[in-house]
Structure formats: structure tokens, C-alpha cells
Design a protein with these regions (language model features):
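A generic structural micro-feature
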Residues: 108-112
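A non-catalytic structural micro-motif
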Residues: 46-55, 70-101, 114-126
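Generic anion/oxyanion-binding catalytic loop in active/binding sites
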Residues: 24, 62, 107
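Periplasmic peptidoglycan-binding/tethering modules of Gram-negative envelope proteins
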Residues: 1-49, 123-126
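Extracytoplasmic/secreted proteins, especially bacterial periplasmic and envelope-associated proteins
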Residues: 30, 34-37, 63, 71, ...
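Short beta-alpha junctions and helix-cap segments that line functional grooves
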Residues: 102-106
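Acidic catalytic loop of the alpha/beta-hydrolase fold
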Residues: 58
């Protein structure tokens, strides 16, 4: 069982990743409960800072996917700020298509690689 307030607690009990539709950076309705849980967890542990990492699938140019990943990360950041997380606790970065979580050139892999990952930067034990 992960220790409360730990990075493992966040990953296992809250969830650190939400997914996006093809060529979209709109937060999907099914992602909202996870992001609401992230915001609540971050409110409970105010010393924690996070980085939202925007990702894209392999289709499209490197430049296009870096821009799309940035918009996805910013969409999640905005959502968390609207739920009360102070802006100063959230950084963003885009990895575009450079860091796939699933290898493959099929819809299943692409769907998983279109995501925003909330990574804990500081303030929580592993």
C-alpha cells in the first residue's frame, strides 16, 4: 500500500495520465474525474509541485506534435488551476511524439500515446 502523499500514492490511487482524441487538446469528459482527483490530492498536499507533460502519437511532423503536446499540457494545467491548484505549482512541457508509452503503429498504441502525464517534481516522497 503506497504511503499517503507519496508519488506512488498519486500514481496508484489518483492516476497520473489522461488521454486525448486524435488531433485534439480538449479535456475529454472521462478525464475530468481523474483531473478532479488530481486537484483534490494536490490540495491535500500543498507542498507538491507538478509538471504536466504533453504527448502525441507518432503521426504528424515533429513540430506539429510538439505544439499539440504543449496545448494538451496547457489544457490540463488550466483545468487544474480552475479547480483551485495554484498556477505556480504547475509547470508544463511538451514531448510531442518523442516519448511514446506504447510502441506500435496502430490505433491502440496511438490512443495511449495521445496523453498528458502529471509528473511530481518535488514535495512528495517516492
Amino acid at each position: 500500500m503506497p504511503a499517503p502523499g507519496s508519488e506512488q500514492d498519486f500514481v496508484v490511487n489518483v492516476g497520473d495520465r489522461v488521454y486525448f482524441d486524435l488531433d485534439s487538446y480538449s479535456v475529454r469528459p472521462e478525464a475530468q474525474p481523474r483531473l478532479d482527483a488530481q486537484a483534490a490530492w494536490l490540495a491535500r498536499y500543498p507542498q507538491v509541485t507538478v509538471r504536466i507533460e504533453g504527448n502525441a502519437d507518432e503521426r504528424g511532423t515533429r513540430e506539429y506534435n510538439l505544439a499539440l503536446g504543449a496545448r494538451r499540457a496547457e489544457a490540463v494545467r488550466t483545468y487544474l488551476i480552475q479547480r483551485g491548484v495554484p498556477a505556480g505549482r504547475i509547470d508544463t512541457i511538451s514531448f510531442g511524439k518523442e516519448r511514446p508509452i506504447v510502441e506500435g503503429s496502430n490505433e491502440s498504441a496511438w490512443a495511449q500515446n495521445r496523453n498528458a502525464h502529471t509528473a511530481i517534481v518535488s514535495g512528495a516522497p517516492r
